[in-house]
């Protein structure tokens, strides 16, 4: 939060948390408190979901904003409360919104004739009904003289007797003090006291609220106020109120002042299976999670099945006292030969011969094991509780130290096991310990033969580390896999002298690719030429043969035109490549003329390539010479980054700029101006001699074609070009005029520009021509 800002108010319902209800579910008797962490602020709120307006007059119909002065109650229904905190200097906080589901409850009205004694009797009766033995609420409210020393604000009633004597012993029963470790300061005498006003403590605002508390809630509050945590290990305080030591770390814990419940006897405390809390087992439900404890008193592992004898013929389980099977009436095996399926698992084979039985499931485990391998229970400890061998106090099963005397009870498990094994093997142990309370099992152990023992070395380091041979094998596999991937990614077909033919088109393509690669490697000129153009997808491919040579022509789409020669080559191919693919006239119309172009010798081909390269170099040089500084500035002014200013264009033309100059893509300057929407520069360029019908590119479009392709954005350029007498009959490489392109776009405004220029008769004639062309297609 930034400095100087006002904290948002908090909307808090003043009630005891109800189990099974959310925080926003309250009733119409619940008080709502609003407060802000920023001091000296006023809180304004609304109950209809509107924004609080503190500057308007509050309480009127047009404004539903109220000023908070004391806790309020809400009507029943779904209420949306919005509150804002405002400081004295009109600094505002954020608006906090809370939605409450308010239920209807009849108001708790206490008649005047009901005195405090009747109410206290009802609450005391409810407390005894919930199983609590201890203090009486009547004496707590009568002893209100000492409330300052106890830091507890109790509700006072005006009809209490003045000068009533109080008993100091009853002050020890007060459980709801602010600190459980506070020592009450008892006053020596008691005198008369004046009538006091009603307290505003939220904990005792409604005396009838204590009647609504269930036994679980009261026991939960008692558990939270009675049991603290250890200051050393933060473990929960022992359930025994007379415990003086922590059962986890053995540190002394301070005693709790005041009267407490009597300590639970042995085997009365246990872990709840639902919440895993240490709770008394003599209650019907868990005091923490309210789960039933009747089913938890006898664990599943202690539910033993009766001994059965399995029939070898049909597999039916029979009682152990029967001699014949109840299903097939076959003879059952004797008890020595029978396969018993009971509650105990078969013991594991041991090397040392020492075993111990689990007190929960009965499984035999090794004597050095700490936990049972079948159910996980700690070995050597009864299922109920553990008893300290020194003082006889009861502790829970997982306790490491005794809560009464503080000795370590964890190590006594092993001592008891070792002693039981020593007594069973008739071997005296070198220690003498007091007899433990745990009952050890006397197991007859067979004496092992000392002559059969031998020392065997084992290795525990690097068990799962691969050997050197395995690592070398993996390296070879990785190398071979890389070689296979390289061969597959860069497949080079074998160079053969003669292709197979006879329909093996894949081998034919491999032959062409191999010889083309070899030819490019051996001829630097061809390699330089083939590396220049940027080619797209393959448009067409033709094969011609005349008995001596085979000519293969591949036509690719060119991505970008970066030089004059390539532009002209593409323009030339626009008229010839399609005809070559269709085989109907042109330069390659006949097979003989097509083959004659490729029937020259190798030296003639090299010389021709050299001449083409020289012509290309000269064309680039001429183009560089044409791009004078004035032309470059003119192209920049009408380009995408320029502004198309008429005064600058006229100045550049006066300085010697060519109005017919072309950029690096061979686009005329007037076409560049049209494509960049600088229609103001078109009349200036036309007046200075620019060719308005100059064609460019592979499609041979004019400036009017390019303006028509722009659509609605090029309508101003179209009007300007038509005003400068641009030819509408000029066709591009596809045989389309600018008017045809306008009809294809379907823009009525652009079409009307063409119609207004040439008249309605010309429009009808062009439309008729267009319809005939579509019918032919």
Curated annotation (Swiss-Prot):
Keyword field contains Membrane: no
Protein origin, superkingdom: Eukaryota
Transmembrane spans: none
Primary localization class, coarse: cytoplasm
Keywords from the UniProt entry: ANK repeat, Cell projection, Cytoplasm, Cytoskeleton, Metal-binding, Phosphoprotein, Repeat, Zinc, Zinc-finger
Subcellular location: Cytoplasm, Cytoskeleton, Microtubule organizing center, Centrosome; Cytoplasm, Cytoskeleton, Cilium basal body
GO molecular function: zinc ion binding
Residue intervals of every DZANK-type zinc finger in the record: 230-289, 358-406
Sequence ranges of Basic and acidic residues compositional bias: 161-176
Region (Disordered): 161-202
Record's subunit section: Interacts with NINL. Associates with DYNC1H1 and multiple dynein intermediate and light chains as well as actin-binding proteins.
Function (record text): Involved in vesicle transport in photoreceptor cells.
The protein's name in its UniProt record: Double zinc ribbon and ankyrin repeat-containing protein 1
Provenance organism: Macaca fascicularis
Gene: DZANK1
């Amino acid at each position: 939060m930034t400095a100087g800002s006002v904290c948002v108010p908090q909307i808090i319902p003043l009630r005891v948390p109800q189990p099974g209800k959310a925080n926003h579910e309250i009733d119409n008797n619940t008080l709502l408190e609003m407060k802000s962490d920023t001091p000296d602020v006023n809180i304004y709120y609304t109950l209809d979901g509107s924004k609080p307006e503190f500057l308007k007059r509050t309480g009127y119909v047009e404004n539903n904003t109220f000023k908070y002065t004391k806790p309020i109650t809400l009507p029943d229904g779904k209420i949306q409360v919005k509150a804002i905190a405002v400081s004295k200097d009109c600094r505002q906080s954020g608006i906090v919104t809370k939605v409450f589901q308010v239920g209807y409850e009849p108001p708790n009205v206490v008649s005047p004739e009901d005195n405090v004694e009747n109410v206290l009797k009802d609450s005391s009766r409810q407390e005894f009904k919930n199983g609590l033995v201890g203090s009486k609420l009547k004496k707590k409210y009568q002893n209100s003289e000492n409330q300052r020393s106890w830091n507890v604000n109790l509700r006072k009633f005006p009809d209490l007797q003045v000068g009533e004597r109080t008993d100091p012993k009853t002050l020890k029963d007060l459980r709801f003090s602010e600190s459980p470790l506070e020592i009450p300061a008892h006053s020596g005498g008691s005198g008369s006291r004046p009538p006091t006003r009603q307290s505003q403590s939220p904990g005792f605002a409604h005396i009838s609220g204590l009647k609504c508390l269930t036994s679980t809630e009261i026991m939960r509050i008692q558990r939270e106020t009675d049991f603290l945590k250890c200051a050393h290990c933060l473990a929960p305080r022992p359930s025994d109120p007379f415990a003086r030591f922590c059962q986890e770390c053995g540190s002394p814990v301070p005693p709790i002042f005041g009267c407490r419940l009597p300590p639970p006897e042995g085997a009365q405390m246990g872990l709840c299976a639902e919440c895993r809390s240490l709770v008394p087992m003599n209650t019907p439900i868990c005091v923490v999670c309210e789960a039933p404890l009747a089913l938890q008193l006898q664990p599943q592992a202690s539910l033993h099945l009766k001994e059965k004898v399995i029939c070898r013929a049909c597999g039916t389980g029979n009682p152990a006292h029967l001699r014949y099977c109840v299903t097939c009436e076959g003879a059952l095996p004797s008890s020595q030969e029978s396969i018993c399926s009971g509650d105990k698992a078969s013991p594991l084979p041991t090397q040392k011969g020492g075993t111990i039985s689990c007190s929960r499931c009965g499984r035999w485990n090794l004597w050095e094991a700490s936990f049972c391998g079948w159910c996980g229970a700690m070995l050597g400890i009864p299922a109920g509780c553990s008893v300290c061998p020194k003082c006889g106090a009861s502790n829970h099963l997982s306790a490491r130290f005794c809560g009464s005397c503080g000795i370590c009870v964890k190590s006594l498990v092993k001592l008891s096991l070792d002693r039981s094994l020593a007594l069973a093997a008739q071997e005296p142990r070198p220690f003498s310990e007091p007899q433990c309370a745990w009952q050890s099992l006397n197991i007859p152990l067979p004496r092992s033969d000392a002559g059969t023992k031998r020392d065997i070395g084992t290795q525990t380091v690097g068990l799962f580390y691969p050997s050197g041979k395995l690592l070398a094998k993996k390296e070879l596999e990785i190398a071979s896999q890389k070689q296979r991937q390289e061969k597959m990614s860069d497949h080079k077909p074998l160079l053969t002298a003669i292709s197979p033919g006879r329909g093996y088109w894949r081998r034919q393509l491999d032959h062409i690719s191999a010889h083309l690669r070899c030819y490019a490697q051996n001829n630097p000129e061809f390699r330089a030429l083939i590396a220049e153009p940027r080619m797209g997808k393959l448009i067409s491919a033709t094969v011609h043969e005349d008995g001596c040579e085979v000519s293969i022509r591949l036509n690719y789409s060119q991505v970008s035109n970066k030089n004059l020669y390539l532009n002209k080559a593409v323009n030339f191919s626009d008229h010839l490549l399609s005809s070559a693919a269709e085989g109907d006239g042109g330069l390659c119309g006949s097979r003989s003329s097509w083959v004659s172009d490729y029937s020259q010798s190798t030296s003639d081909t090299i010389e021709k390539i050299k001449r083409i390269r020289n012509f290309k170099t000269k064309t680039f040089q001429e183009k560089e010479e044409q791009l004078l500084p004035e032309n470059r500035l003119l192209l920049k002014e009408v380009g995408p980054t320029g502004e198309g200013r008429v005064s600058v264009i006229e100045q550049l033309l006066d300085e010697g700029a060519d109005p017919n100059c072309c950029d690096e893509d061979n686009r005329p300057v007037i076409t560049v101006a049209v494509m960049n929407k600088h229609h103001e520069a078109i009349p200036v360029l036309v007046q200075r001699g620019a060719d308005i019908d100059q064609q460019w590119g592979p499609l041979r479009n004019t400036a009017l074609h390019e303006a028509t392709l722009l659509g609605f954005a090029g309508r101003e350029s179209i009007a300007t070009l038509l005003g400068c007498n641009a030819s509408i009959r000029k066709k591009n490489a596809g045989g389309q005029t600018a008017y045809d392109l306008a009809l294809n776009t379907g823009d009525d405004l652009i079409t009307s520009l063409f119609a207004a220029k040439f008249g309605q008769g010309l429009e009808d004639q062009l439309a008729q021509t267009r319809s005939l062309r579509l019918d032919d297609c």
